[in-house]
Amino acid sequence: MNHLRAEGPASVLAIGTANPENILIQDEFPDYYFRVTKSEHMTQLKEKFRKICDKSMIRKRNCFLNEEHLKQNPRLVEHEMQTLDARQDMLVVEVPKLGKDACAKAIKEWGQPKSKITHLIFTSASTTDMPGADYHCAKLLGLSPSVKRVMMYQLGCYGGGTVLRIAKDIAENNKGARVLAVCCDMTACLFRGPSDSNLELLVGQAIFGDGAAAVIVGAEPDESVGERPIFELVSTGQTFLPNSEGTIGGHIREAGLMFDLHKDVPMLISNNIEKCLIEAFTPIGISDWNSIFWITHPGGKAILDKVEEKLHLKSDKFVDSRHVLSEHGNMSSSTVLFVMDELRKRSLEEGKSTTGDGFEWGVLFGFGPGLTVERVVLRSVPINY
């Protein structure tokens, strides 16, 4: 049966990203948020929110949900109003559309006929429906009706690592497979007005943005037709951290997605991440974490700061994660793929020798509900100028 499996590791062959056109400027967002939610009388809470926004290190975010949508659906701004139907009516349409835009960019970069796509993986925590966003995305793209689909709902911020793990397994165990994997999350599922009794809500309103990212994954790239690897997917792993239950979570209620984020998350991640690194890199003989490139989900500034401090990383190791956080906020599952895209583009622009900032080996980390950690060991490829 080995002849049915690919020879060699799977690689990322193309990357595409997409955001809604509507832009939220972080400096202006506290005034906007408290105005559109009719909460300007909550002056003390507004000042707390302004401080959260100021400390977020976010410059701007993209968001499909704009003021016109809120005028058409005024109940969305109420803190616990029964608005799930209205949110889902929007998101079951918009999530596949934004995902399709990212996929189209990845397919264009790949340069091959979309008829060669054999598998489609889609993840989103923003909506749930049957048939799912995978089906609608496939229809929008005009993929073959026989494309093999996998739909994963409610993974959250570690989903970017999950789609790479599953795409790798599919590509390596099905000779000739070309897997289109897409992540898309949108904040219309959790946007709501402020509450004095729920300060965690303010953090979510301050950091989350809308985005979609897609990759094409395959083994044995066919260079005769122009396929080129960007990163090899060497190994993958997933774990949930001890004593972390309830620190990150999301719960679908009549009022939409209710988000939990505990203040101990940065400490939990920073205290446990080296164990994940040792397990991943001991077989390769690497123990210097400054000798690898980093593609890290920027769940928030505090997470990056704590990990950098704990591992004694050089300040440039998270430059791509910090850039994506600044320009887009936390887009949940797609964010880490935005970071991957930023790293390979910056490596080319700065004349680095490899797609991984000049380093051969690297790691991708996603963090999310559980507290779950998803990691992928990557190998960069040389850049030929």
From Swiss-Prot:
Main localization (coarse): cytoplasm
Cellular component, GO, one term: cytoplasm
GO molecular function: acyltransferase activity, transferring groups other than amino-acyl groups
Signal peptide: none
Keyword field contains Ribonucleoprotein: no
Highest taxon above the source species: Eukaryota
EC number(s) recorded for this UniProt protein: 2.3.1.-
Record's subcellular location: Cytoplasm
Gene Ontology biological process terms in this record: polyketide biosynthetic process
Annotated catalytic residues: C157
Coiled coil start-end: none
Entry keyword annotation includes Acyltransferase: yes
Pfam families reported for this sequence: Chal_sti_synt_C, Chal_sti_synt_N
Tissue-specificity statement: Expressed in leaves and glandular trichomes.
Protein keywords: Acyltransferase, Cytoplasm, Transferase
Function: Polyketide synthase responsible for the biosynthesis of secondary metabolites.
Family the entry assigns: Belongs to the thiolase-like superfamily. Chalcone/stilbene synthases family.
PANTHER family named in the record: CHALCONE SYNTHASE, HYDROXYMETHYLGLUTARYL-COA SYNTHASE
Protein name per UniProt: Polyketide synthase 2
Organism: Cannabis sativa
Source species taxonomy: Eukaryota, Viridiplantae, Streptophyta, Embryophyta, Tracheophyta
